A protein has these predicted regions:
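N-terminal active-site segment of His-dependent metallophosphoesterases
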Residues: 18-98, 173
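Short amphipathic alpha-helical segments and helix-helix/interface helices
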Residues: 9, 61-65, 108-112
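Sterically constrained small-residue positions within well-ordered secondary structures
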Residues: 12, 29-32, 168, 177
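Bacterial Sec-dependent N-terminal signal peptides
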Residues: 1-23
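Extended active-site neighborhood of metal-dependent phosphoesterases/phosphodiesterases
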Residues: 89-183
Length: 183
């Protein structure tokens, strides 16, 4: 009986290795070819605060990048809270296992996949400011998401306003969309 099980397992393994691997998810397409898409990313802080979750945010931005043309993605809107805490260097295993800098770097790295391909607009959240949650207004947002890094912002950003430090930043900016069929 053991010999039969080993033979069966060997045949299944051998046949599975001969099957072609799927390189990408099934191609996406719009129901109405005249329409376009805007993608909404919810608070990514849950992805960035644990190192084990960070690849999930990478997968989200990879999927977006892979579908820009087929879904006619005109913009990615992010509700903010890129990080759990803006300026915390103390790890708390129950709440997070990344420092704030590591969280900012993970968010920035995931979003880089979209640079020069599609504009992404981030509404900075309360967790993106202060030490824990906006108590002093300081943020690393412009250090990790500077205007210059994504050329697609030039076409739709109508203004960058000064932040609390007097620095023009995407954390306080205005965008304008001019697409047929919009609005």
């Amino acid at each position: 009986m053991k010999l039969f099980n080993y033979l069966l397992a060997g045949i299944l393994c051998a046949s599975a290795t001969c099957l072609p691997a799927q390189h990408r998810a099934d191609p996406q397409k719009l129901v109405n070819p005249e329409s376009f898409s805007m993608i909404l990313l919810g608070d990514p802080q849950g992805y960035t605060k644990y190192d084990i979750n960070q690849p999930l945010f990478d997968l989200c931005t990879a999927w977006i990048a892979d579908n820009i043309e087929s879904l006619k993605i005109k913009a990615v809107l992010c509700t903010g809270d890129l990080v759990e805490q803006n300026d915390n260097n103390v790890l708390n295993r129950k709440m997070l296992n990344q420092t704030s800098r590591e969280m900012w770097e993970a968010a920035s790295q995931a979003l880089k996949r979209l640079d020069n391909k599609v504009p992404y607009i981030i509404a900075a959240g309360n967790h993106d400011y202060g030490y824990k949650a906006a108590e002093n207004g300081r943020t690393y947002f412009p250090d990790y998401i500077p205007f210059e890094r994504n050329s697609t912002w030039r076409n739709i950003c109508v203004s960058e306003f000064p932040n609390r430090e007097g620095r023009a930043s995407l954390e306080n900016s205005a965008f304008e969309f001019d697409e047929p069929g919009w609005g």
